[in-house]
Amino acid sequence: GIIATSITSPALAASRSRIDSRVDTAMRELKSLGNRFSNLIDSSAGILMMPRIRRGGFGFGTSYGEGALLIGKAPVEYYSIASASFGLQFGIQRYSSAMFFTSERSLTRFRRQDGWTVGADLGYTLIDQGDVIDIDSNTYTDDVYGVIFGQEGLHIGISLEGSKYSRIVR
């Protein structure tokens, strides 16, 4: 409870330049995993990159992070991701996530909404890092793909489901 709240507090809000730097680092890390993500990176209408999401909890868990929506590899808007949950979970973890919008329609829908809850407002497919090698622009079946990478620490019960993305001003 208290530990999780202090770790994931929005008081840790970052400046625009710090977010840009963290997004660049996360993108390099994602690319360093091999060519498996090349097709998604190159052909996506937009990428919502959320580096350094902090998650913590003991029974009650919270998470918070800030990142940028990239269109044409340039940041165009800034977002936060936050969640709260109750259940079988414990630990502290830091990780990054990327949401790949594979169509202009899904990207436009995301940008027009005032907040977006994963799994409720738009369907997505969470892909395992090892599965990406089989995904290319000819086999996309969903408008949004998500990946979690760069995990540090241990947290039982990690998921993007129920996390809320909100536009922020930086």
Labelled PLM ranges:
Residues 1-9:
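N-terminal export signals
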Residues 13-170:
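Small-residue-enriched, tightly packed secondary-structure blocks
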